[in-house]
Amino acid sequence: VLEARDRVGGRAWTDHLPDGTIIERGAEWVEDVQVEMVALCDRLGIPLARTGMSYHDRRPVGGPPVSDDELAAGRAALRALFAELGDEAYDISVADAIERLDQPEGVKIAFRARIECTSGAPATELAAWHLLHLASAPEQVDSPRIGTGSDAPVRALAALLGARIHLSEPVVALSIDDNGVSVQTTKAEHRAAHIVLALPKPIVVQEPFAALLPTEVLAAASTFGVSHAAKLFVPLLGTAEPSAVLDTRHDYWVWTANQGNEGLRPVLAGFMGSQPMLDLFEVERDGTTWARSVAEVRPDLELDFDAAGTQTWHDDPYAQGIYTHVRPGDRPNDELLRQRHGRLVLAGEFTDDVWSGFMEGAIRSGQRAASLLDPSLPAPAAATH
């Protein structure tokens, strides 16, 4: 396993504040229906911790008042709209689809902000298909996280692999011929019978990897847009209850959440989507502007804004974004991403057909890659949102 970074995990990266409080710089949430993630944690003895709040239930602020009943009715209207749209959900934008809803303005504003935040792009640049995750969101769930940090499964798997993992070893060249695969890194040359490219989409379509892809596979991968987002961490100075609030003006949500039976994790976390909002809030510089906005959104919380921090991914050379999205009018032939191409197989969350953008998608892609190379190994289980 050749890893360019000095750590395993990629966009699953658990870190700590100076007082030891866990923060998640990347992936964070687990859903009960994510069967492969739940099963993997169970096999590795890694506990899931209930948060006392729902990843799906975010109280909208900043727009027209809207009730829980109105939001529930809006989601029902979305489901009806999807049944009507069919394949047209790939042709029109999220913005256009929301305007078709006969719902209160507050509902439509909340839905647009939610999807722009989660999908990491403006609503005009997202195919209406992205609304499906909101339409199918479960009601009143207590969302779980990995109690010891989102990268715990990665660290556990890395411990099993031991010295077979090579850290800080970026690939600079690679080739495939009749004799196998040759990979040149900054440190050594490696040869193998097959290769699995487990890379984010922006990286796999760049050299030296792009030249290895069949033309139609490169075209399929290139069809996806790249999403951008940032995370915020602000230590809590006082007490708080688990909560989730969506700022509908600025495409971000913030939450306070339990760490299972240990009680509240003493930090307010946030997630902001779409590059225009990241630029507006200057998140690449620091978290000051964002933290000031949070003070208006959550005046009820006592927060240590001087210690606020952010994490961005668009400026990370090994990520260049958070995940992918489908643009209006584009219908990526993504089935090609889940097939074996001679000695080459792709992996990575963006290749999954159900859980793209989630740790579940990454796990499923790895299982699929292993099964494609060795059919005696099980493929991932059937999945649904």
Question: Where do the language-model regions lie?
Answer:
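Glycine-rich FAD pyrophosphate-binding loop
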Residues: 1-18
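A short alpha-helix-loop-beta-strand transition element characteristic
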Residues: 37-58, 88, 102-112, 241-247, ...
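Catalytic cores of eukaryotic secretory-pathway lumenal/extracellular enzymes that build
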Residues: 14, 18-20, 27-37, 197, ...
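Central helical "cap/lid" subdomain
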Residues: 175-176, 185-243
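Conserved flavin/dinucleotide-binding core of flavoenzymes
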Residues: 180, 190, 229, 250-385
